[in-house]
Amino acid sequence: HGAVLGGDISSFVLKRGYTATLSRNANGSGFSINYVAADGDLRIGALPANLNNQVRFIRIFPWRWVAKKGSCDVSPAALDAHWYYNWNITSQTANSDYEYVAIKQQRWWPSLNQDWQHLGIHHLLGYNEPDNPVEDAYTSLDGGRVSIAVAAWPELEGAGLRIGAPAVTDGGYNWIVDIIHQAEAAGRRVDYVPIHYYRSYWNKNDPAGAADQLYNFLKGIYDAAHKPIWLTEFNYGAYWTDNAHDPDVTQNRNAIDAMIHKLDDTPWLERYAIYSRVEWFRQTHYDGGGITPMGQMYKDHESPIGYQQILPGEGMHPSAQYAFCLLY
């Protein structure tokens, strides 16, 4: 649960191993900032003017040092993934092997009235593919309207979690850039940007080229949004993409291998999750059982820790400081 405060906070020390969200409104909405003390104590000597002596809400969770590799449509245990999500908010409890990430799939579902502390959930993904007319998120936003998503955003802020923007398709560049700009203008908080990617590459025998194409696509979004990127669905093409360049199982394995090594070497890319069920030659597991070459490679792959702590300027230290640990 979040703590409701009287507002007289201008500085604080967040101990290493915790994340805290501070907000102007008692329900967690309004101007807010999420802080993470991953690699050392975080000392904030002066809050921004929009929060200084105006903090009404704080929610604090233990931080988890999660590696980049994740899963979505396949069990995290089957891929030795470090985190996963399932397009829902289910009764998952904290697990020492992998982190469960919640999602607000569309505007009306699922409910965010949750006991986040009990569930051990620290991250929340925004709407799923609101730029895609076949998705519920598109319909629930009256045809994927960015303005409606921004107006509804305080509900997500109220959870007090680290919030991801709506996850668009790989054709949704303009949509995601638009919502980032509108959210910033409205004072809404977006902490990272999820994205989906299913593009093939013209040369099926050039895995490095496929990896560079993915990197350049993500770099364009990062340069526009200036926020960490999560690749929450991806594969080397799909059944709705360019069938003339469909890979065989070996070519798919090699392309995904090159892609995830490129992602591991990209500091602003926090997390990625393979999506398997896009034709048998792209799957992590065969329909009849057994793991594919790509699935085995992905399972064996060891990825680095995703989050990179950035220490903001501490400024001058006011006379009062608050050392935050864990609140219930």
Regions found by a protein language model. Give the residues of each.
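Catalytic-core region of carbohydrate-active enzymes that cleave or remodel glycosidic bonds
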Residues: 214-269
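Alpha-helical scaffolding within the catalytic cores
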Residues: 84-92, 106-117, 147-151, 169-185, ...
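N-terminal carbohydrate-binding/catalytic regions of secreted carbohydrate-active enzymes
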Residues: 66-124
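Compact beta-sheet-dominated domain cores in extracellular/mature segments
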Residues: 1-69, 73-80, 91-93, 293, ...
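Aromatic- and acid-rich polysaccharide-binding/catalytic face
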Residues: 128, 177-220, 227-240, 274-277
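Active-site neighborhood of glycoside hydrolase catalytic domains
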Residues: 148-162, 224
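Aromatic-rich peripheral "rim/lid" segments of glycoside hydrolase catalytic domains that contact
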Residues: 97, 101, 241-242, 246-247, ...
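Active-site groove signature of glycoside hydrolases
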Residues: 118-141, 164-170, 190-201, 230-234, ...
